[in-house]
C-alpha cells in the first residue's frame, strides 16, 4: 500500500516540498536562511495577531494601548518585544539570504529571484508601516518624512501624498490605514513566499559550487530538516537573548515619547535595517534624485542577473569577484553607520562616497571582474 503522504492531495504537496524533495548533498549553512525566514514570518504573524487584539489604531489611544499591552496584558511585554526584535531578526536573515544569492549566483533562477525582490519590497513596506503604529515621536516623524518623499514625483506628487495621508498631514486616517495594511501585508508575503518556493522547486536548489548537482541528490528529510531545526534553535536563542536582556538595544528612545506634531526630534532616522537606504537617500542634495537613488538601491537587484558576465555561476572559484563582494558588504555596513549619524561633516562626504561606491561596485566592478576572470581561464 502506498504511503498516505504520497497520495493525499494536500500531504502530497507538503511531501514534495519538505520530505522527499531531492536536495544537493553539499549545501552549506547559508542555505538555512530560507527556512529561518519562514519561521520569522510565522512568529511575526502570531505575535502580531495577539498584539492586534489589544492595540487601538486611533491617534488618541494608540500610544497608551501599547503601554497597556506592556504593563497590563499577561506576558504582553514579551509579545511586544518579540514582535519588535523579531522584525530585526527577519531583516538579518533577509540580508544574509540575499547576500547568499549574490555570492553563489542563485539569481540565475530568474523567476525565483524576481519574486524574492518583490518579497523584499513587501517586507520593507510592512516593517515601515509597523514602525508607525506605536505612535511615538519617531513613528510620527518617520511616517511624515518618508511619505513626504512621494511629493518629489512630478505633477502628481502632492496629490499622491495627501491621498496616502487621508488629509493634509499624518493623522488619524493615516494611522488607521497603516494598521490595516500592516495587518494584511504579512499574509500577502506568505502567499508570495509560496510562489517563491514553487518557482525554486521547478529548478531545484543551487549549491556552493554553482555546478549542477543532479548526479548527487539526497532527500530533504531527515538531512536538511534536522539542519533547519538547528538553525531555528540558534535563531530563537539569539531572538530571546535580545528580547530578555536588551529589548530596546535596536530601538530608538524617541519612540517612548508620544507623537507630537509641534515638536520635531533633532535626528529623524528609521530602524537600523533601513539606514543603508536612508544614507543613500540623504547623500543626494536633490529631492527627486534622492528618492530615485533610494528606490534603485533595492531595485538594482533586478539588474544583477543581466550583469552576470562570468562563465561560472558561483563566486566560489572567483577570487577577484569575492574581494569585490566583501567590499560591497563593508560598503553597506558603512552606509548603515552613516544613516544613523547627523547630517554634518565628515558624515556627508563619507555617505556620498559610500553611495557612489555601492552603485559602482554592482554596476561596473562586478561585471568587469567577471570578464577579467574569464580571460584568466582562457575561456
UniProtKB/Swiss-Prot annotation:
Component of the ubiquinol-cytochrome c reductase complex (complex III or cytochrome b-c1 complex) that is part of the mitochondrial respiratory chain. The b-c1 complex mediates electron transfer from ubiquinol to cytochrome c. Contributes to the generation of a proton gradient across the mitochondrial membrane that is then used for ATP synthesis. Heme b b566 binds at residues 97, 196. Keywords: Electron transport, Heme, Iron, Membrane, Metal-binding, Mitochondrion, Mitochondrion inner membrane, Respiratory chain, Transmembrane, Transmembrane helix, Transport, Ubiquinone. Heme b b562 binds at residues 83, 182. It comes from Oryx leucoryx. GO terms for biological process: mitochondrial electron transport, ubiquinol to cytochrome c. Its cofactor is heme b. Binds 2 heme b groups non-covalently. A ubiquinone binds at residue 201. GO terms for molecular function: metal ion binding; ubiquinol-cytochrome-c reductase activity. This is Cytochrome b. SUPFAM superfamilies: a domain/subunit of cytochrome bc1 complex (Ubiquinol-cytochrome c reductase), Transmembrane di-heme cytochromes. Belongs to the cytochrome b family.
Amino acid at each position: 500500500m502506498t504511503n498516505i503522504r504520497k497520495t493525499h492531495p494536500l500531504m502530497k504537496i507538503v511531501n514534495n516540498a519538505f520530505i522527499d524533495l531531492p536536495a544537493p548533498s553539499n549545501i552549506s549553512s547559508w542555505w538555512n536562511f530560507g527556512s529561518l525566514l519562514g519561521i520569522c514570518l510565522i512568529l511575526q504573524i502570531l505575535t502580531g495577531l495577539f498584539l492586534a487584539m489589544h492595540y487601538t489604531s486611533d491617534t488618541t489611544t494608540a500610544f497608551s494601548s501599547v503601554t497597556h499591552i506592556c504593563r497590563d496584558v499577561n506576558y504582553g511585554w514579551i509579545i511586544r518585544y518579540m514582535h519588535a526584535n523579531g522584525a530585526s531578526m527577519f531583516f538579518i536573515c533577509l540580508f544574509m539570504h540575499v547576500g547568499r544569492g549574490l555570492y553563489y549566483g542563485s539569481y540565475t533562477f530568474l523567476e525565483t529571484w524576481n519574486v524574492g525582490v518583490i518579497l523584499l519590497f513587501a517586507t520593507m513596506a510592512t516593517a515601515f508601516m509597523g514602525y508607525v503604529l506605536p505612535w511615538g515621536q519617531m513613528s510620527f516623524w518617520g511616517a511624515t518624512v518618508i511619505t513626504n518623499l512621494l511629493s518629489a514625483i512630478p505633477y502628481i506628487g502632492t496629490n499622491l501624498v495627501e491621498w496616502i495621508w487621508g488629509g493634509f498631514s499624518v493623522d488619524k486616517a493615516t494611522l488607521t490605514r497603516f494598521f490595516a495594511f500592516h495587518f494584511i501585508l504579512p499574509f500577502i508575503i506568505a502567499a508570495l513566499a509560496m510562489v517563491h518556493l514553487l518557482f525554486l522547486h521547478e529548478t531545484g536548489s543551487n549549491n556552493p559550487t554553482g555546478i549542477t548537482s543532479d548526479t548527487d541528490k539526497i532527500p530533504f528529510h531527515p538531512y536538511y530538516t534536522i539542519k533547519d531545526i538547528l538553525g531555528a534553535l540558534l535563531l530563537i536563542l539569539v531572538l530571546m537573548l535580545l528580547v530578555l536582556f536588551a529589548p530596546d538595544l535596536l530601538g530608538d528612545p524617541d519612540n517612548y515619547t508620544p507623537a507630537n506634531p509641534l515638536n520635531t526630534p533633532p535626528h529623524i532616522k528609521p530602524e537600523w535595517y533601513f539606514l543603508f537606504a536612508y544614507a543613500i537617500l540623504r547623500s543626494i542634495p536633490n529631492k527627486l534624485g534622492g528618492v530615485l537613488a533610494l528606490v534603485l538601491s533595492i531595485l538594482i537587484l533586478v539588474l544583477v542577473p543581466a550583469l552576470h558576465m562570468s562563465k561560472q555561476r558561483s563566486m566560489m572559484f572567483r577570487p577577484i569577484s569575492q574581494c569585490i563582494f566583501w567590499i560591497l558588504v563593508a560598503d553597506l555596513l558603512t552606509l548603515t553607520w552613516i544613516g544613523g549619524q547627523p547630517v554634518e561633516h565628515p558624515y556627508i562626504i563619507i555617505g556620498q562616497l559610500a553611495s557612489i561606491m555601492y552603485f559602482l561596485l554592482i554596476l561596473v566592478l562586478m561585471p568587469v571582474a567577471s570578464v577579467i576572470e574569464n580571460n584568466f581561464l582562457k575561456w
